[in-house]
């Protein structure tokens, strides 16, 4: 993959427009998780230290285009950056006709989605953004799967278009995990539905040595294995797909192991009583919410022998502690492994935080949808345009 990197360019006195993913959760004007902001800071500091005139843009939430709303403002983000950089960062609301920025100064543009044409990748908007800068830096892996004016269009028209350190790092880590992995390659895919991750499972079943499924996804595989899943969340219409995927994995000398024991309850609530039982004893009124210790132990052994681990999704309803032991054991096994490990997806990152293993994972991806699309083997539009511009 050949793309120009920000680190290779001389940025002194250059107008540098950086697209970051600063889409953080904000409640009552307060940021509740700063993970994406922390991930973006090294890029911003590098550009500032290089003496660039730095402009930063991002979306936040899903406002109606052309209708600015205070709850979607990047003001809390701007305040956070001011504190983190120990420097007064300006929030600029009218920027499309030009902005005065001094060398060594950083400003933040108000929510890019307040502009008409952002989502549709409108050329007029993209050209206006491109005219603001000498160098466009795409650094938002989390939005790289979307062709929008601020991720794709601007890269088409900017004088120079390159990848920032965060995006470059994501692509290198994912490439290391999927293109030329140390074997055995183990992928752990959790989540509620097979349908939302079918293409991911399809793609991975052909390249991994072991595909571990968890959460609601596992229930469909349990049903495909001939067991009763009671009232569990599962997709009856995808049982045949689950059978096909298992056969596909086996044809590739891999496997998709089905849990031997599970943790069940008769209601979905924080106070539900958890019961451990063999997978073939689930009754009609029960729901599966976690894997049992026997299954967790077997998966721990698979993880311990891995050369590369890709983790996307918890294996149980870990938000409730009585159904969190499976995810906790898996998380700890990944943390204890010497394999190259990469974790991505919102729920996965929440589990990484809960069990405090962030420093034990080789690479934590900031992307949700982009991470999944990369796993599916899809081209990311915002990366593709950078490749074209590098030629």
From Swiss-Prot:
<keyword id="KW-0067">ATP-binding</keyword>
<keyword id="KW-0547">Nucleotide-binding</keyword>
<feature type="binding site">
    <location>
        <position position="319"/>
    </location>
    <ligand>
        <name>ATP</name>
    </ligand>
</feature>
<feature type="binding site">
    <location>
        <position position="197"/>
    </location>
    <ligand>
        <name>ATP</name>
    </ligand>
</feature>
<dbReference type="GO" id="GO:0043531">
    <property type="term" value="F:ADP binding"/>
</dbReference>
<feature type="binding site">
    <location>
        <begin position="345"/>
        <end position="348"/>
    </location>
    <ligand>
        <name>ATP</name>
    </ligand>
</feature>
<dbReference type="Pfam" id="PF00162">
    <property type="entry name" value="PGK"/>
</dbReference>
<protein>
    <recommendedName>
        <fullName>Phosphoglycerate kinase</fullName>
        <ecNumber>2.7.2.3</ecNumber>
    </recommendedName>
</protein>
<dbReference type="GO" id="GO:0004618">
    <property type="term" value="F:phosphoglycerate kinase activity"/>
</dbReference>
<dbReference type="InterPro" id="IPR015824">
    <property type="entry name" value="Phosphoglycerate_kinase_N"/>
</dbReference>
<dbReference type="InterPro" id="IPR001576">
    <property type="entry name" value="Phosphoglycerate_kinase"/>
</dbReference>
<keyword id="KW-0963">Cytoplasm</keyword>
<feature type="binding site">
    <location>
        <position position="113"/>
    </location>
    <ligand>
        <name>substrate</name>
    </ligand>
</feature>
<feature type="binding site">
    <location>
        <begin position="21"/>
        <end position="23"/>
    </location>
    <ligand>
        <name>substrate</name>
    </ligand>
</feature>
<comment type="similarity">
    <text>Belongs to the phosphoglycerate kinase family.</text>
</comment>
<keyword id="KW-0808">Transferase</keyword>
<dbReference type="InterPro" id="IPR015911">
    <property type="entry name" value="Phosphoglycerate_kinase_CS"/>
</dbReference>
<dbReference type="GO" id="GO:0005524">
    <property type="term" value="F:ATP binding"/>
</dbReference>
<comment type="subunit">
    <text>Monomer.</text>
</comment>
<keyword id="KW-0418">Kinase</keyword>
<dbReference type="GO" id="GO:0006096">
    <property type="term" value="P:glycolytic process"/>
</dbReference>
<feature type="binding site">
    <location>
        <position position="146"/>
    </location>
    <ligand>
        <name>substrate</name>
    </ligand>
</feature>
<dbReference type="GO" id="GO:0006094">
    <property type="term" value="P:gluconeogenesis"/>
</dbReference>
<dbReference type="InterPro" id="IPR036043">
    <property type="entry name" value="Phosphoglycerate_kinase_sf"/>
</dbReference>
<keyword id="KW-0324">Glycolysis</keyword>
<dbReference type="GO" id="GO:0005829">
    <property type="term" value="C:cytosol"/>
</dbReference>
<feature type="binding site">
    <location>
        <position position="36"/>
    </location>
    <ligand>
        <name>substrate</name>
    </ligand>
</feature>
<feature type="binding site">
    <location>
        <begin position="59"/>
        <end position="62"/>
    </location>
    <ligand>
        <name>substrate</name>
    </ligand>
</feature>
<comment type="pathway">
    <text>Carbohydrate degradation; glycolysis; pyruvate from D-glyceraldehyde 3-phosphate: step 2/5.</text>
</comment>
């Amino acid at each position: 993959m050949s793309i120009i990197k920000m680190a290779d360019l001389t940025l002194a006195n250059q107008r540098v427009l950086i697209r970051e993913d600063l889409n953080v959760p904000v409640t009552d004007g307060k940021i509740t998780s700063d993970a994406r902001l922390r991930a973006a800071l090294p890029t911003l500091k590098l550009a500032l230290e290089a003496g660039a005139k730095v402009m930063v843009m991002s979306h936040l939430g899903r406002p109606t285009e052309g209708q600015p709303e205070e709850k979607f403002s990047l003001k809390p983000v701007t305040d956070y950056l001011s504190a983190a950089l120990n420097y007064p960062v300006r929030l600029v609301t009218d920027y499309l006709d030009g902005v005065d920025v001094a060398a060594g100064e950083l400003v933040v543009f108000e929510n890019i989605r307040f502009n008409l044409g952002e989502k549709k990748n409108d050329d007029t908007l993209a050209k206006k953004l491109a005219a603001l800068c000498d160098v466009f830096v795409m650094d938002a892996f989390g939005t790289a799967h979307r062709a929008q004016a601020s991720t794709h269009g601007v890269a088409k028209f900017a004088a120079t278009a390159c990848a920032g350190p965060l995006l470059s790092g994501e692509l290198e880590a994912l490439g290391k995990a999927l293109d030329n992995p140390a074997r055995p390659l183990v992928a752990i895919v959790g989540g509620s539905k097979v349908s939302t991750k079918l293409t991911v499972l399809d793609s991975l079943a052909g390249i991994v040595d072991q595909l571990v499924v968890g959460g609601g996804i596992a229930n469909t595989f349990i049903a495909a294995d001939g067991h009763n899943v009671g009232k569990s969340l599962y997709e009856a219409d995808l049982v045949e797909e689950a059978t096909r995927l298992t056969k596909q994995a086996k044809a590739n000398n891999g496997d998709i192991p089905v849990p031997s024991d599970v943790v069940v309850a008769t209601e979905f609530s924080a106070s539900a009583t958890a019961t451990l039982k063999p997978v073939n004893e689930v009754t009609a009124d029960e729901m599966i919410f976690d894997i049992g210790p026997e299954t967790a132990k077997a998966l721990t052994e698979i993880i311990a022998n891995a050369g590369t681990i890709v983790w996307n999704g918890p294996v149980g309803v870990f938000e409730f502690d009585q159904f969190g032991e499976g995810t906790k054991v898996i998380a700890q096994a990944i943390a204890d492994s010497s394999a190259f490990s990469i974790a991505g997806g919102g729920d996965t990152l929440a589990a990484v935080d809960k069990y405090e293993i962030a420093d034990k994972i080789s690479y934590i991806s900031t992307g949700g949808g982009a991470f999944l699309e990369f796993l599916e083997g899809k081209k990311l539009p915002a990366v593709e345009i950078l490749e074209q511009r590098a030629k």
